[in-house]
């Protein structure tokens, strides 16, 4: 969609095949809706090199965009300069800023949902008042025990002395996803400078932005929000 809005004349989609060699039908349906010009059943680092340098069946492209695993990112780093890329992304991440009035159950659900990405995806919870993190940790353990899809994950608990200090930490770490669910969420949002996307208020869960409300899901990760922005037509 972003490529079409930007006026790209040739849109090429690559997607890893299933064991039967076929691309998932939902992916093909999405490609049809977006009017992709070419579709190839190939994924991983090999897809990146094929797009950048061409093969007997794939003509090279000028720009490669889209998320991927560590091997995909390594390949994008290797071909950067031969072709343009959207960003150098690491594992998906989430930071939540909360206080004593936050709904800790909802915060725990959002953190555990993000944990489904795997243990390499960093999760950070920042409180602006004493005593919140202990209660949140207990809630996360309860939710994780209820959800069979939750994997082992890394959750950092940060006790910030003030809301301003919490936002300073956010701007230095540049999270991909930032949830502001403290009482002062709306006021704090205007001070955020580097997050890939910002969810303001208790009912603005990350999953909504990833799958429903967001303009796209190609966001800077691993602190690269300081130098990269989300994928856009610009």
Where are these regions (language model features)?
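A glycine- and small/hydrophobic-rich beta-loop-beta segment
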Residues: 113, 117, 125-195
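Short, solvent-exposed amphipathic alpha-helical segments in soluble enzyme
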Residues: 28-30, 56, 80-82, 110-115, ...
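Short hydrophobic alpha-helical runs that function as membrane-insertion/retention elements
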Residues: 10-14, 38-41, 124, 178-181, ...
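Conserved small-residue-rich beta-alpha loop and adjacent elements
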Residues: 1-29
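Conserved NAD(P)+-binding/catalytic subdomain of aldehyde/semialdehyde dehydrogenases
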Residues: 33-124
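Short acidic loop-to-helix transition motifs that present clustered carboxylates
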Residues: 18-23, 42-50, 163, 185
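Short, ordered loop/turn segments at secondary-structure junctions
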Residues: 15-19, 44, 69, 100-102, ...
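C-terminal core of ALDH-fold dehydrogenases
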Residues: 172-234
């Amino acid at each position: 969609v972003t490529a079409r809005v930007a006026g790209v004349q040739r849109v090429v989609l690559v997607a890893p095949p299933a064991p039967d060699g076929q691309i998932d039908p939902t992916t093909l349906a999405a490609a049809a809706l977006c009017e992709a010009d070419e579709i190839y059943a190939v994924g991983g680092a090999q897809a990146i090199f094929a797009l950048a340098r061409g093969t007997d069946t794939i003509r090279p492209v000028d720009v490669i965009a889209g998320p991927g695993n560590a091997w995909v990112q390594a390949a994008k780093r290797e071909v950067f300069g031969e072709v343009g890329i959207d960003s150098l992304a690491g594992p998906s991440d989430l930071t939540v800023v909360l206080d004593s009035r936050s709904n800790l159950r909802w915060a725990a659900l959002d953190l555990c949902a993000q944990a489904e990405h795997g243990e390499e995806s960093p999760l950070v919870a920042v409180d602006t008042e004493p005593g919140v993190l202990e209660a949140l940790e207990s809630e996360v353990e309860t939710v994780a025990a209820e959800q069979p899809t939750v994997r082992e994950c890394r959750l950092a608990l940060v006790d910030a002395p003030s809301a301003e200090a919490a936002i300073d930490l956010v701007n230095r770490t540049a999270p991909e996803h930032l949830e502001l669910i403290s009482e002062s969420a709306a006021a704090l949002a205007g001070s955020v400078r580097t997050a890939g996307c910002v969810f303001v208020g208790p009912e603005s869960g990350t999953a909504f932005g990833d799958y429903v409300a967001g303009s796209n899901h190609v966001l800077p990760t691993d602190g690269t929000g300081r130098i990269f922005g989300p994928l856009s037509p610009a």
